[in-house]
């Protein structure tokens, strides 16, 4: 399913005629340029590869430079792929714009969530804290027991423990499109999306309507 790559500009709110406030995220979607078309014969699947934005030539690595030179497309800030059906017709260098969402009411937005670093179980998994008093002097935020006894004699995989929090690929589904600003290439969706301001987002039509 084809989508578009955009940039998160931040959050705001708009008011309805009745005066109620709607929290929105503003996503800037510049034109996506097709750099490569994958087919079943050479790649075993159908997809289009796109780029967006601009990147200075002296910032490109040699493989990237050669790839953009071969396709004849202006270098962008990254490369993304969207699976397609074989009956869909696309050409290298073709631009895909925000108007593909004109008839869409809901979208799925994918991004990289904010990294929180190494976090304990209270923050990472919402564990409850232990007693502040009643003889507890050192174990206020510790997770407690992580196993049983000689049997099974190990810690089960997937045990909720302290560790790295955030910086994961996250998809938020079924976000309502509030407004599309064609002139400024802005997509306004209701609610929050993953990642910090300025991060790249993948926006696709919702699959679970």
Swiss-Prot record:
GO biological process entries: translation
Pfam families listed in its UniProt record: Ribosomal_L3
Residue positions where N5-methylglutamine is found in the record: 150
Entry GO CC: cytosolic large ribosomal subunit
InterPro entries (UniProt xref): Ribosomal_uL3, Ribosomal_uL3_bac/org-type, Ribosomal_uL3_CS, Transl_B-barrel_sf
GO molecular function annotations of the record: rRNA binding; structural constituent of ribosome
Keywords for this protein: Methylation, Ribonucleoprotein, Ribosomal protein, RNA-binding, rRNA-binding
Gene3D superfamilies referenced in this protein's UniProt entry, alphabetically: 3.30.160.810, Translation factors
Post-translational modification: Methylated by PrmB.
Organism domain of life: Bacteria
UniProt family annotation: Belongs to the universal ribosomal protein uL3 family.
Function: One of the primary rRNA binding proteins, it binds directly near the 3'-end of the 23S rRNA, where it nucleates assembly of the 50S subunit.
Subunit structure and binding partners: Part of the 50S ribosomal subunit. Forms a cluster with proteins L14 and L19.
Stored HAMAP family: Ribosomal_uL3_B (MF_01325_B)
Protein name: Large ribosomal subunit protein uL3
Species annotation: Buchnera aphidicola subsp. Schizaphis graminum (strain Sg)
